[in-house]
Amino acid sequence: MKIDTVILGGGIAGLSVAYHLKNKKYVILEKEHLVGGLCKSVTDKNGFIYDYTGHLLHIKSKYVKKLVRKLLKKNLALKNRNSWIYSNNVFTRYPFQANLFGLPEKIIYECIEGFVEAKLLNSQFSILNSQFCFYDWCLKTFGNGISKYFMIPYNEKLWRIDIKKLTCDWLGNYVPQPTLQEVITGAFTDNNKKIGYNATFFYPKMGGIQSLIDELKKNIPGIKTDVKISSIDISKKIVKTNSGEMKYKNLVSTIPLPEIVKLIKGVPENVKKASKKLKWTSVLNINLGIKRKNISNKHWIYFPEKKFNFYRAGFYRNFSESLCPEGTSSMYIEISYRNRKTSKEKMLKKTIGKLKSAKILKSSDKIISECILDIPYAYVIYDKNRKSSLETIRNYLRKNFIFSIGRFGGWKYSTMEDAILEGKETTKWLK
């Protein structure tokens, strides 16, 4: 069988490519039974709908906003972010650096003093200065206090590496940088000013994030699921799968770079070596259904302290009441890991205990649903090897007419909106 464009992976990036190819001949090959990648939901026997962690639509592009509204129509709600940090036994608003109000007085003054000192000493400092690692950037941008109580411990917990080895290439607009006035205002008043790229978000009213995928795939007839790729012959332009061979003109890959390098026959040694230098963080996504309504009024909470094994927890009912049966609540808890040794059962037990110690769960709460989703590839690590390794691999793939896109195909920190736009843009290169 010969196809103009073969798309590897049915996540949102791959689906976007197919959607924007319109009437051209293509096929999506997806290894799972359902498309969506990490942008999908599961429904358990009790009627709880769980996403693969919090999948919220932070949309800036007019095009993507128009597309999402076209697909979901009335099944779309705009939410104002209500996110918090739990540390020092108190809740403070997100972002930490602009909302110190509620913390012990000593910590507030330590954070303000450090911030002022950083501003005085580093007035010419630029995020674009590549000589700085993320650790240095935190100290130069926020000072010792804010770095000590949130930026350093939280990011060490998320990335699972020494953040002195983390570059600043991923930052973009993801880390809010408040002014001195905003820091002081947020230190002495309960300031609800929305700061950051995710101050608002869209989310489906019904069906979880899966509803976006369901509407998108209605416009994409060329989808094959349960397809396992065994090898790719770039000289003959053939993809070999468990259901036969497929000859292509263009190959678009959204699968993780280390995985596609393994699949290609005769990969040069320098490309193999570059692939082995790529690093990433995995996430264990624990979902719980609780027989109590309104366990929290928050969207999600960050946990920077080491005593908690998770870095973030969110509450589905506050995205949409349709995600929980009547009289119940549900939540997702995210635990990042690299080379996990602890069993899922032990991690679940510890997580429940820590949620109780933070008084999010009560000792009397009855957990009526548990769903653990393992995400092997979750966050790309930006270290000193990423840029050169990525360039080596992508140059090789491009030379062989393979377009590698998306979070893991492009090996980058990106959003659902980014994936949709990149999928659209990629179609311009497919002839």
Predicted regions and their residues:
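N-terminal Rossmann-like FAD-binding beta1-loop-alpha1 element of flavoenzymes
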Residues: 3-28
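Active-site/ligand-binding neighborhood in enzyme catalytic cores
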Residues: 90, 101, 107-108, 112-116, ...
